[in-house]
Swiss-Prot record:
Name this protein carries in UniProt: Large ribosomal subunit protein uL14
A cellular-component GO term for this protein: cytosolic large ribosomal subunit
Signal peptide: none
UniProt-listed Pfam families: Ribosomal_L14
RNA-binding as UniProt keyword: yes
Top-level taxon of origin: Archaea
Organism: Haloarcula marismortui (strain ATCC 43049 / DSM 3752 / JCM 8966 / VKM B-1809)
Keywords attached to this entry: Ribonucleoprotein, Ribosomal protein, RNA-binding, rRNA-binding
Cross-referenced InterPro entries: Ribosomal_uL14 (IPR000218), Ribosomal_uL14_arc (IPR019971), Ribosomal_uL14_CS (IPR019972), Ribosomal_uL14_sf (IPR036853)
Family: Belongs to the universal ribosomal protein uL14 family.
Lineage: Archaea, Methanobacteriati, Methanobacteriota, Stenosarchaea group, Halobacteria
Length: 132
């Protein structure tokens, strides 16, 4: 996985409810764990923009509900700082469901995704309509 070019402050923690930004049938996701997170004892795992997370589908089609899947965070409300000094934040927290090869399971992505996510996950960027 490629390093991010921005200083990403983690805006999501374990148990956060986020929207699903693709057309897989899931509408709302709950963060269960964060891949590669090694924290201190009794500290909640935190995820930020471009992190791979394990989620549970809380709202969506009956086939998708209650499934445990992998996802990538594509938008977060907490501002991130880019190397040129600009800060970027989005209106909502959103993720895209991916398979084991980190390809998106949906065919289209709703809303914009961050440039940092596009650099790290090229297949997610190819399905995106707008990159900010």
């Amino acid at each position: 996985m490629e390093a991010l070019g921005a200083d990403v402050t983690q805006g999501l923690e374990k148990g956060s409810l986020i929207t699903c930004a693709d057309n897989t049938g899931a509408r709302e996701l709950k963060v269960i764990s964060v891949h590669g997170y090694s924290g201190t004892k009794n500290r909640h795992p935190k995820a930020g923009l471009g992190d791979k997370i394990t989620v549970s589908v809380t709202k969506g089609t009956p086939e998708m509900r209650r499934q445990v899947l992998e996802a990538v965070v594509v938008r977060q409300r907490k501002p991130i700082r880019r190397p040129d000094g600009t800060r970027v934040k989005f209106e909502d927290n959103a993720a895209v469901i991916v398979d084991e090869n980190e390809d998106p399971r949906g065919t289209e992505l709703k809303g914009p995704i961050a440039r940092e996510v596009a650099q790290r996950f090229g297949s997610v960027a190819s399905a995106a309509t707008m990159i900010v």
